[in-house]
């Protein structure tokens, strides 16, 4: 497995991008602080890989910033695990790129 990305050395709060497309706003409205969300990397071979954020149940909510998502996606594809929880959910009058903030944290496979 590749080395842990530097962005995961400590828990990291980051906004989720793309929360206003399709049915994502409805999924966003179901989330609250403390909820666990699912992180899914793009499949291998994608030119600009990223990590997608899904609500419990599987609905897509958005994606990570490319500077975080690209190294994290490669690491996850290679077997790394990362968990995430909702840190903040803003109302519809909050800028879309700041509407959902999650906390990323490395997950030790041996501890699961």
Enumerate the language-model features and the residues they cover.
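Conserved active-site motif detector
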Residues: 1-112
């Amino acid at each position: 497995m590749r080395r842990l990305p530097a962005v995961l050395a400590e828990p990291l709060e980051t906004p989720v991008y793309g929360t206003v497309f399709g049915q994502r706003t409805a999924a966003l409205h179901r989330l609250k602080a403390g909820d666990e969300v699912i992180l899914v990397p793009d499949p291998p071979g994608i030119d600009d890989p990223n990590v997608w954020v899904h609500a419990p149940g599987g609905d897509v909510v958005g994606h990570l910033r490319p500077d975080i998502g690209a190294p994290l996606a490669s690491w996850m594809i290679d077997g790394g695990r990362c968990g995430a929880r909702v840190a903040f959910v803003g109302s519809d009058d909050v800028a879309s790129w700041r509407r959902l903030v999650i906390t990323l944290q490395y997950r030790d496979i041996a501890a699961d």
